[in-house]
């Protein structure tokens, strides 16, 4: 009788077990419609007060963007402002809204000639984030103050043609540091690109 229960238990246990095949997710194949890109690993370069970083996004030997930090004293409001900027030069464009801010893009967000609420401008100075320093305490402002691996849209104009791209950024308010991870720019003119692709 004991052996019968043991055999029945083992038989039931074997029937209740089933092999589960693991789900293997493969990376998506490259999109046949996405343009070929030039990528740069920026090695998580840090930009702090008193520092700046030039970026040659299209590898043509001249800088396209400048990231810098400025300390501005405001005696009227009795506060200081530690400001983190992204700057573009002639024929290098950043998206601007009416407050001179640029959108924070997520991975795979589209970047093209138009972006609702924003306009491409060359020779731009975009305030990414700022620390407001007062006698009553400090605070942070700006669209980019809490980002981690988000994308700044950029546009390069060469020979009258537009090339779209992005710079991957993070921000650390504790260290008061802007972090530059990667950049990408299309090699094909007037093509929509995906942020981070």
Task: State what each model feature region is.
Residues 2-8:
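Sec-dependent signal peptide recognition
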Residues 9-10, 51:
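Residue-level detector of alpha-helix boundary/anchor positions
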Residues 13-16:
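C-terminal motif of bacterial Sec signal peptides marking the signal peptidase cleavage site
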Residues 21-163, 171-197:
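A domain-level signal for the mature, folded cores of soluble proteins
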Residues 167:
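Short beta-strand-centered aromatic/proline hotspots
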């Amino acid at each position: 009788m004991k052996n019968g229960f043991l055999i029945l238990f083992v038989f039931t246990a074997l029937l209740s077990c089933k092999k589960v095949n693991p789900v293997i997710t493969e990376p998506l194949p490259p999109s046949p419609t996405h343009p070929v890109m030039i990528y740069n690993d920026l090695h998580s370069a840090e930009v702090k007060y008193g520092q700046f970083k030039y970026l040659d996004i299209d590898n043509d030997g001249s800088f396209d963007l400048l990231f810098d930090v400025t300390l501005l004293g405001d005696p009227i409001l009795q506060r200081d402002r530690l400001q983190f900027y992204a700057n573009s030069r002639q024929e290098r464009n950043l998206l601007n809204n009416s407050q001179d801010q640029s959108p924070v893009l997520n991975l795979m967000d589209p970047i093209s000639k138009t972006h609702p609420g924003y306009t491409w401008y060359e020779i731009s100075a975009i305030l990414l984030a700022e620390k407001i320093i007062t006698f009553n305490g400090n605070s942070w402002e700006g669209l980019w103050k809490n980002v981690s691996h988000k994308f700044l849209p950029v546009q390069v104009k060469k020979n009258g043609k537009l090339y779209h791209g992005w710079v991957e950024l993070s921000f650390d308010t504790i260290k008061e540091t802007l972090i530059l991870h990667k950049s990408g720019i299309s090699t094909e003119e007037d093509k929509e690109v995906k942020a981070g692709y």
